[in-house]
């Protein structure tokens, strides 16, 4: 796709992902912005029309924004509308959400859509009682899982290479504790890593962190 034709890019990614998934493959998509998640997620939904797909987003932001044009803030609202159009459930879990980085309208939409949320503070202070049960629920309840990781969920000190670095965030070691059981579940069908921006990186620090996450996913994925 040439230029800034986001809808065409979404459709091209959607078709490529659906083709791969129908061929028995899994998909790992790298960047750019979180708008990538709509094309990737829609392709997974298209490939498994009769199955329950759980969407797990590791992110400081809910990305359920109302907007006339698609952007990195709209992908999960777009996926919710896609699920509505396909007359299927929208099963969305967001882990690492910053209470300070989302408007009340986004919290209201999340409540209306019955989004399962684990805030960043809960990840840091109640991992065993809030995060692990949510992961276990997703693994038990859904036929397929789609994991999307916005790198701005990491603290700014570990991931400077994003447009909205997190003041608090979920540390890399903790993030990997979330990722590992999903990778080993046998249900993880698709993963993406998004929002890395090399223009904001410091001495390659963010690139190395992102590469380690990608390596661990490939290493653990069953």
UniProtKB/Swiss-Prot annotation:
GO terms for biological process: L-histidine catabolic process to glutamate and formamide; L-histidine catabolic process to glutamate and formate; putrescine biosynthetic process from arginine, via agmatine. It holds the Pfam family Arginase. Disulfide bonds: none annotated. It catalyses: N-formimidoyl-L-glutamate + H2O = formamide + L-glutamate. Its EC number is 3.5.3.8. Gene3D superfamilies: Ureohydrolase domain (3.40.800.10). Mn(2+) 1 binds at residues 34, 59, 63, 150. Keywords: Histidine metabolism, Hydrolase, Manganese, Metal-binding. GO terms for molecular function: agmatinase activity; formimidoylglutamase activity; metal ion binding. Mn(2+) 2 binds at residues 59, 61, 150, 152. It comes from the Bacteria. Binds 2 manganese ions per subunit. Pathway: Amino-acid degradation; L-histidine degradation into L-glutamate; L-glutamate from N-formimidoyl-L-glutamate (hydrolase route): step 1/1. Its cofactor is Mn(2+). Catalyzes the conversion of N-formimidoyl-L-glutamate to L-glutamate and formamide. Belongs to the arginase family. This is Formimidoylglutamase. It comes from Klebsiella aerogenes (Enterobacter aerogenes).
């Amino acid at each position: 796709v040439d230029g800034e034709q986001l809808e065409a890019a979404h459709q091209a990614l959607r078709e490529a992902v659906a083709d791969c998934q129908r061929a028995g493959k899994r998909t790992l998509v790298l960047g750019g912005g979180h708008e990538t998640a709509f094309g990737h997620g829609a392709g997974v939904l298209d490939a498994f029309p009769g199955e329950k797909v759980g969407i797990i987003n590791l992110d400081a932001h809910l990305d359920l924004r109302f907007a006339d044009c698609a952007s990195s803030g709209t992908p999960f609202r777009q996926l919710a509308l896609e699920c509505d159009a396909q007359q299927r459930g929208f099963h969305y879990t967001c882990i690492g959400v910053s209470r300070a980085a989302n408007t009340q309208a986004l919290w209201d939409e999340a409540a209306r859509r019955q989004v399962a949320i684990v805030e960043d503070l809960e990840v840091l202070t109640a991992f065993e009682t809030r995060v692990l049960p949510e992961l276990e629920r997703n693994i038990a309840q859904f036929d397929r899982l789609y994991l999307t990781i916005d790198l701005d969920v990491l603290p700014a000190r570990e991931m400077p290479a994003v447009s909205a670095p997190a003041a608090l965030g979920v540390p890399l070691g903790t993030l990997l504790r979330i990722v590992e059981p999903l990778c080993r579940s046998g249900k993880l069908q698709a993963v993406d890593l998004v929002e890395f921006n090399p223009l904001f990186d410091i001495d390659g620090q963010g690139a190395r962190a992102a590469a380690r996450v990608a390596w661990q996913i490939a290493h653990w994925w069953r």
